[in-house]
């Protein structure tokens, strides 16, 4: 199953639907789905308090947990929770990149003063103009400090497949260590959502008046010296 829509792409007879309209529509869609993922991963983070004293984990999960900036002594023996913390931090930076055009790539971390972003309330805030769709817990911590955050940033995802692969690392570890019951439910539902929505939520159908298509084809044919008067 994949989702599709025409909002932002219906230019057939509507001069007010422009390239900027399409860009806004696609951006808002991505903001919505990234916020959804952040909330779901935060829920998993809260629920997966498995201790290494009771349950083993794979080496891949241990490596992911080690990359988390969550260094609390209360969670040092909870690799699954710290792994979800790491995943959430990457999603947050992906959302910031989308809104600020500030891509960090791998290996960067958020400044300590914004660390509480990852532990606060996950309620969302949506404004009427469609440009402030960002969780309150991000918005409150980053307000007025984005210039500094550009220097010390969270890691980010290149695409939804990379996000899914991180989730699969956790799923596979659970399956390998008698955690089948924990795989069903929220984790499986999140994996299904990633398959359906990716980082774009839905494709956008493009509709355009036939005269515009004709003019575009004519220009292409003329520039390629195929037909000068299409």
Task: Outline where the language-model segments fall.
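An acidic- and aromatic-residue-enriched active-site/binding cleft used to recognize and process polar
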Residues: 6-8, 20-22, 204-209
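Extended, charge-enriched "interface" segments that sit outside catalytic cores
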Residues: 50-230
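Trp/Phe/Arg-rich N-terminal binding region typifying the photolyase-homology
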Residues: 3, 21, 25-26, 56-57
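A generic secondary-structure signal for well-formed alpha-helical elements
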Residues: 41-48, 52
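Active-site and channel-lining beta-strand-loop segments
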Residues: 3-17
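Extended active-site and interfacial segments that coordinate phosphate-rich ligands
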Residues: 19-43, 219-221
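Extended, Lys/Arg-enriched charged tracts that mediate electrostatic binding to polyanionic substrates
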Residues: 1-3, 180
